[in-house]
Amino acid sequence: MFHMKETPAEAPLREALRLLEGTGLAVALGGSGLLGALGLAESARDWDLTTEADADRVAAALGGLPLERNGPDGIHTDHRIRIAGGVVEILCGFSIRAPRGVVRVPTIVSARVEGVPLGSPEAWAAAYALLGREEKFERLMSWLAVRGADPLVVSRLRAEPLPETLSARLASLPRLLAAPSGPA
């Protein structure tokens, strides 16, 4: 998928998407899968999906698939559901504890590639900054600096209790002038 050199099996990702979207849930691929789709990574160790639906609704939508549930821990204040032995991790209500409060990272579909809904690069840049993953944060910020950022997504993120430096970096991105044509 996405022309990456190394990825986990795609079948569990596609099955999760089929089941979740089939019940009307909005979901989006983030993490290394998103980076790979944007040409910013050559491998992914798992598929990270986000949704704003709660964990009970997600579990019900997965229709009896074997799953593992994890609640808030450490910096994560969300709930996570893992399927296929962790090949797919679904972050339900993706949120991260930050110095100024809990930051809710929205699930926004920015494009579809090979039938897979891609998450917002702006939202994942903010998430990576909050998670202390500086290299991935900078890759996404560089990508956004060239292509432009969706001003509505940036505004939504800046309404969260972000650290001032992160809020300022997001605000400094050039605005996306046209509708995105895809991840390239």
Protein language model features and the residues they cover:
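Compositionally biased terminal segments of proteins
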Residues: M1-A184
